[in-house]
């Protein structure tokens, strides 16, 4: 082990540490960071060399953050990344600095938004917030309106998590939806992601995603938003149901094929009585 450590350069150590951090399960960033910190034993090297990993983790996970003075949380995503550690809160029309390690937002300031698409963005956000409130107990959503390749585009992001460290599990749902505002009809593209980590008496991770495509009728802002939410709700309900049914099937078939619940004798052993079984047999043979 010592020889291996001597062979690794600082650059290689940081690269390995960054991979651990980026792949940390939901709600376990701090635990993974602290473990990596102990292994690397060089705080300056870790902070400087793995800073990109901290940022990438928060962007990938749609990390929610509360901005002081504002009621609703906003998601940290690539769509709101303004560069130099600054992010956009499109609902409140503010920009803020975000510390990727501490996960804290500071220095909120007024920020310009894409006015040409703002009425569409607001309508979608209003409808999406009502949907998220109904379906996600801890859900947060952020809706962006921007021009991409000259086209007015709406991007809607949803995040919901449950961190139950005391019960040895953590999980996060993420979904991202996108469509351009074009006459008559447009295509909606979505991706749904689920990640769950269970670590009591074992170490099991569920990592799943599904790509979605559907057609959306474009009329006025409010009606288009309603039709968009119908697509989102149908797809996410179907995905959640499929995941639940799949794991029930695996429990009933695959897991049972991998391991017997009962030993070959088809009877359970009472381990509290195993000693008395042996003593009783020896007494009979005496």
Curated annotation (Swiss-Prot):
Pfam families: F-actin_cap_A
Highest taxon of the lineage: Eukaryota
Gene3D superfamilies: F-actin capping protein, alpha subunit, F-actin capping protein, beta subunit
Full protein name: F-actin-capping protein subunit alpha-2
Keywords associated with the record: Acetylation, Actin capping, Actin-binding, Phosphoprotein
Modified residues (Phosphoserine): 9
Family per similarity comment: Belongs to the F-actin-capping protein alpha subunit family.
GO molecular function: actin filament binding
Record PTM N-acetylalanine, positions in chain: 2
GO biological process: actin cytoskeleton organization; barbed-end actin filament capping; protein-containing complex assembly
One Gene Ontology CC term in the entry: F-actin capping protein complex
Subunit (UniProt): Component of the F-actin capping complex, composed of a heterodimer of an alpha and a beta subunit. Component of the WASH complex, composed of F-actin-capping protein subunit alpha (CAPZA1, CAPZA2 or CAPZA3), F-actin-capping protein subunit beta (CAPZB), WASH (WASHC1, WASH2P, WASH3P, WASH4P, WASH5P or WASH6P), WASHC2 (WASHC2A or WASHC2C), WASHC3, WASHC4 and WASHC5. Interacts with RCSD1/CAPZIP. Directly interacts with CRACD; this interaction decreases binding to actin.
Function: F-actin-capping proteins bind in a Ca(2+)-independent manner to the fast growing ends of actin filaments (barbed end) thereby blocking the exchange of subunits at these ends. Unlike other capping proteins (such as gelsolin and severin), these proteins do not sever actin filaments.
């Amino acid at each position: 082990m010592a020889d291996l450590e001597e062979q690794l350069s600082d650059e290689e150590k940081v690269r390995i540490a960054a991979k651990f951090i980026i792949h940390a399960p939901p709600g376990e960033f701090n635990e993974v960071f602290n473990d990596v910190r102990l292994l690397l034993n060089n705080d300056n090297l870790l902070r400087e060399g793995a800073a990109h990993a901290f940022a990438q983790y928060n962007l990938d996970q749609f990390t929610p953050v509360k901005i002081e003075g504002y009621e609703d949380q906003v998601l940290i995503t690539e769509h709101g990344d303004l560069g130099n550690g600054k992010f956009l809160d499109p609902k409140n029309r503010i920009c803020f600095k975000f510390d990727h390690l501490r996960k804290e937002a500071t220095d909120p300031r007024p920020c310009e938004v894409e006015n040409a698409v703002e009425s569409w963005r607001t309508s979608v956000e209003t409808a999406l917030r009502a949907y998220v409130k109904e379906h996600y107990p801890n859900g947060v959503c952020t809706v962006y309106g921007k021009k991409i390749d000259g086209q007015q585009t709406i991007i809607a992001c949803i995040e919901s998590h449950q961190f139950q460290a005391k019960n040895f599990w953590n999980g996060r749902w993420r979904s991202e939806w996108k469509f351009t505002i074009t006459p008559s009809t447009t295509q909606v593209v979505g991706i749904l992601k689920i990640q769950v980590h269970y670590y009591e008496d074992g170490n099991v991770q569920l990592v799943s995603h599904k790509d979605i495509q559907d057609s959306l009728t474009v009329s006025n802002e409010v009606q288009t938003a309603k039709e968009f939410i119908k697509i989102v709700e149908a797809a996410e309900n179907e995905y959640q149901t499929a995941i639940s049914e799949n794991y029930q099937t695996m429990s009933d078939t695959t897991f049972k094929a991998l391991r017997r619940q009962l030993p070959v004798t088809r009877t359970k052993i009472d381990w509290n009585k195993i000693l008395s079984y042996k003593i009783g047999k020896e007494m009979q043979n005496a």
